[in-house]
């Protein structure tokens, strides 16, 4: 895991109110202005006041981000305070770097450290409250050290041609992001779900404005200068769930919980959960028909064409079979060259509201190429995710 955000409602105490901007203060319902009381009746009002923590601590101390929201309920005549705590990188928080990965067994240490760091910045909360706090954001992640014969850039190039449906980024948006980072980062988004892929080591060597990981610790700088990472490429895979409803939808079955039950900080440290989530999210990309076409491994356009012809001929020699072979090749070649989203978007500009027909055609097209493997890089990532080996600093010394 990497980023985690969770909420505490009233079960905390702030001892250093001046650390917040504006300065933190508590009010009763009777102290609210007339306008605030009116706002408290509106269900669209998320909060009345927001306090952001700006602690005066040593920059070497990796602290959580904290925001407090003041919310009023006109029906009960009460004012509540909800604290949102975000740890932007659990490995950095616990290990001072995120080359390494945390373990399931680190749960108690991380919860204790959270209580300790919060106390340092003027917030008193119990370990039990942290453990049972509902989670609102969680980023699952995996570092995969690539063998020398696999180029990370080729993997990112393949993934940039994939698509996850109409709600996701267009391929054009993905290419803009890739160009901004010299082709070193690929994002796929779906509302509050997001996939992110990049080179972990190269990212840390970039200027802050171009990095995915904006906060570089002093220890990470030392590691970069003292360890020989020069010949290593590390594929960073992050699957980000950015809303509590999305988290419940993804995790309630894996945790044997009902959808209505909250997912807590302690729940996230369940054995096997991280692998299950990341493997499932990866397969969601690979199993879509348009992505199967995008990720095909073929030496040349002619090889792909001849393979499709032979497969179609084996089915039957009718004119229908020939037509199927021709449009299958056209779809496959266009998607490999320009990306699934671009092809689908351009088709939809001409044949409006024909999504179901196109989806059906894409599914049929995969039947003629289902015996062509995915690219070597994609296959390598799939294999490494299934193995899900723990990564620490010794892993970088030995490689794979």
Residue ranges and their predicted role:
Residues 1-338, 342, 362-400:
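Structured, helix-rich domain cores that form ligand/interaction pockets
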Residues 343-353:
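Helix-turn-helix DNA-binding segment
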Residues 354-358:
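Residues in the recognition helix of alpha-helical DNA-binding motifs
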């Amino acid at each position: 895991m990497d980023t985690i955000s969770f909420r505490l409602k009233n079960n905390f105490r702030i001892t250093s109110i001046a650390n917040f901007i504006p300065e933190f203060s508590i009010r009763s319902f009777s102290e609210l202005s007339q306008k605030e009381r009116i706002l408290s009746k509106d269900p669209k009002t998320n909060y009345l006041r927001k306090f952001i923590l700006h602690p005066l601590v040593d920059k070497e101390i990796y602290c959580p981000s904290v925001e407090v929201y003041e919310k009023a309920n006109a029906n009960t005549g009460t004012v509540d305070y909800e604290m949102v705590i975000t740890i932007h990188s659990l490995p950095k928080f616990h290990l001072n770097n995120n080359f390494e990965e945390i373990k399931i067994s680190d749960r108690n240490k991380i919860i204790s450290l959270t209580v300790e760091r919060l106390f340092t910045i003027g917030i008193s909360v119990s370990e039990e409250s942290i453990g049972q706090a509902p989670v609102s954001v969680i980023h699952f992640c995996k570092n995969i050290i690539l063998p020398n014969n696999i180029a990370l850039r080729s993997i990112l190039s393949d993934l940039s041609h994939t698509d996850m449906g109409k709600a996701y980024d267009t391929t054009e948006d993905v290419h803009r992001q890739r160009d901004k980072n010299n082709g070193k980062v690929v994002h796929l988004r779906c509302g509050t779900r997001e996939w992110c892929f990049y080179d972990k080591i190269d990212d840390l060597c970039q200027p802050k404005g171009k990095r995915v990981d904006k906060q570089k610790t002093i220890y990470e700088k030392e590691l970069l200068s003292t360890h020989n990472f020069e010949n290593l490429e590390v594929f960073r895979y992050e699957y980000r769930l950015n809303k509590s409803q999305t988290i419940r939808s993804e995790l309630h079955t894996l945790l044997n919980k009902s959808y209505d039950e909250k997912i807590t900080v302690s729940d996230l440290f369940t054995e096997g959960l991280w692998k299950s989530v990341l493997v499932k999210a990866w397969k969601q990309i690979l199993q879509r028909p348009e992505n199967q076409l995008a990720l095909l491994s073929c030496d040349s356009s002619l090889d792909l064409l001849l393979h499709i012809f032979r497969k179609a001929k084996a089915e039957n020699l009718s004119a229908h079979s020939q037509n199927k072979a021709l449009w299958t090749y056209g779809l496959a070649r266009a998607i490999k060259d320009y990306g699934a989203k671009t092809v689908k978007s351009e088709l939809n500009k001409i044949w409006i509201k024909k999504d179901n027909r196109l989806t059906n055609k894409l599914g049929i097209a995969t039947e003629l190429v289902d015996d062509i493997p995915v690219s070597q890089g994609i296959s390598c990532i799939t294999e490494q995710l299934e193995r899900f080996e723990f990564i620490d600093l010794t892993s970088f010394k030995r490689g794979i």
